[in-house]
């Protein structure tokens, strides 16, 4: 089946990372930024996780941004809305230091370029738990530019999260494509490969594999970036 649109995950796919190490480092930076506003570090982290859970559970009745801040304010009170500009500044400025907790693989940008040259459209289907500025930054850390993608999902422009299939339905609706014309590329055997249930083709990138349920990955096309390019473009475009 011809592939017309390739959807890429970001964290652990285009941007190599150990998610636990990244999250620990990122939370430490955030806690330092807002400590002067009275947010104790552990309570802050617990609050962010609660807000994240609210986004993952979002039924589409609001944006993920609204779901996060509603839950966060239920924990810390309405004062969080007055503090929101400080959090926004964190993601624009201080968050850049979190690059130190990520890896880099030049093959990521190479693969995106080859696939675009092959004539495929590309979009970034990253789990929309982060604000726009934090997502733009992580794209650049991967050696790419936001303009390389027709769409990238953020907590501002999304109403569902992975692994909810409605997240993928929203993405293909925004792009005006059919599921069967899409290939979802990601490193998570649950959150990314679930796109297959909508009729999408899938490719499991194994460089930073997440397989919490120990699934048999041989049921999906899988491998590194070289194998991905060969899968999409054919042997003639393989390196």
Task: Identify the residue ranges that each predicted region occupies.
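Asp-based, Mg2+/Mn2+-dependent phosphohydrolase catalytic module
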Residues: 1-6, 109, 113, 129-130, ...
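Hydrophobic alpha-helical core bundles mediating ligand binding, dimerization, or RNAP-core interactions
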Residues: 23-31, 48-52, 69, 90-95, ...
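Active-site neighborhood of HAD-like aspartate-dependent phosphohydrolases
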Residues: 1-47
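Short, acidic loop-to-helix structural element flanking the phosphoryl-transfer center
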Residues: 63-66, 83-85, 92-123
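Short, solvent-exposed loop/turn segments at secondary-structure boundaries
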Residues: 18-21, 59, 217
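A metal-dependent, Asp-based hydrolase signature
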Residues: 46-92
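Short amphipathic alpha-helical segments at helix boundaries and their inter-helical linkers
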Residues: 52-66, 95-103, 157-167, 194-201
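A cross-family glycoside hydrolase active-site/sugar-binding cleft signature
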Residues: 125-127
